[in-house]
Structures are given as C-alpha cells and as structure tokens.
Design a protein with these regions (language model features):
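N-terminal segments that cap or nucleate solenoid repeat domains
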Residues: 2-48
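Short, well-ordered alpha-helix to beta-strand connector turns
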Residues: 13, 22, 31, 40, ...
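Intrinsic low-complexity/IDR segments
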Residues: 3-9, 114, 172, 180-184, ...
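Extended low-polarity, hydrophobic cluster-rich segments
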Residues: 33, 49-52, 66-68, 86, ...
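Glycine-centered beta-turn/loop sites at beta-strand termini
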Residues: 18, 27, 36-37, 45, ...
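Conserved positions within tandem-repeat grammars
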Residues: 59, 77, 86, 105, ...
Length: 198
C-alpha cells in the first residue's frame, strides 16, 4: 500500500500502522492512534486528538493538535509543535527533546540506563519527571507552574526561565551514597521551592 493510501487510512479510520523501517507518517484528520513500529520515524500530526506509539528508534514528531500523547521506548525522541494538552511517556534509554508551546505538558521519562531531557517552550503548566540511573535535565522556558522531579543517581538539572511557581527536586534513584548532581537555577518566580537530596 502506498504512503498516500496509508495516510488516508488514518484520516478515515483513525488508525495508522507503520513498519519496522524508517517511516514518514502524516496523520491528518479528526484523530486516532498511530502505531509507528521500530525504525527512525518522522510523524507529522494535524488532528484534534492523537496517541502515537513510536516504539524503538530515533523518532521525530511534529505538528499541532488539541491533545497529543506519545508513548516511546528506546532511542532518541524529538517532539516539536503546538498542542493544547500534551503527554509524553518514555520507558527506555535515549534522549528526549521537546520544543513547543501548550496549555499543559506532562513529560515522564523512566528509561533506566541513560537519557537526557531537553525542554524549550512555554505552557501554563509544565510537569517534568525523570527517573533512572543517569540523566541531565535542561529546562529553558516559561510556565505558570513548573514542576521538575529529577530522580537519578548521576546528573545535573539546569533551569533557565520563569514561572508563577517553580518546584525543583533533585533526588537519588537507587544509590544515595553514590549519587551526585547539581541544580543550576537562573530564573524568576512568584515562588520557588528548590530541593536537593544528593
């Protein structure tokens, strides 16, 4: 089946299946579910609501929607766009990069081995969580409420931006005695709660 027919399948059925190769997927329509499979995939969304299972590989997701949820495993993930509400869940190793704007964005990276989070954007609420062995978090942006929970044994947190209230927590994952990492805060806030347990 050609790419055009596969993309039209999403428009009319709300489902789009990729391969285990490097796919270029356009998801345009009211909404639905994307199963990208393995490989290095590029996904362009223009929908009311979509959930994308990006699997393994280095994946790039771009576009806009009222609701966007991405579920990723191993490999780097790059997300860019404008969404009213966004959720990103990453369970395997690899970096996660987000560039965009939204009313609210929730990022949860639980890959054990390694994987940084790089955030650049703005939202009324930014909720960022990283749990694993090794990771840095770099935040540049603005939000009404910013919450960053950094739970790794090794890694630094850098915050550059502003918010109505900023809550930053740096803690250890599974080895307190060997944990290390700094918090670098360069920002403004109506209120700031900054805590380090390493």
């Amino acid at each position: 089946m050609s790419k055009i027919l596969k993309d039209l399948e999403f428009t009319f059925t709300g489902k789009r299946y990729g391969t285990d190769g490097n796919d270029d997927i356009d998801a345009i329509g009211f909404g639905g579910i994307i199963y990208a499979g393995k490989g290095h995939d590029t996904i362009t969304v223009g929908t009311f609501a979509v959930t994308a299972y990006t699997g393994d590989g280095h994946d790039f997701v771009r576009g806009g929607s009222a609701y966007l949820k991405i579920i990723d495993e191993n490999g780097d993930l790059d997300v860019r766009g404008l969404n009213a509400w966004g959720e990103i869940e990453k369970s395997g190793h690899g970096d996660l990069k987000y560039v965009g704007a939204s009313a609210a964005i929730k990022i949860n990276h639980t890959g054990y081995e390694y994987g940084n989070i790089n955030y650049s954007g703005a939202a009324i609420a930014n909720i960022i969580t990283r749990k694993g062995a090794i990771s840095n978090i770099n935040y540049q942006g603005a939000g009404g409420y910013n919450q960053i929970w950094h739970e790794t044994n090794t890694g630094n947190m850098t915050f550059k931006g502003g918010g109505g209230y900023n809550k930053l927590v740096r803690t250890w994952f599974n080895s307190y005695q060997n944990s290390k990492g700094n918090i670098n805060f360069e920002g403004l806030g109506g209120g700031n709660g900054i805590f380090s347990r390493v």
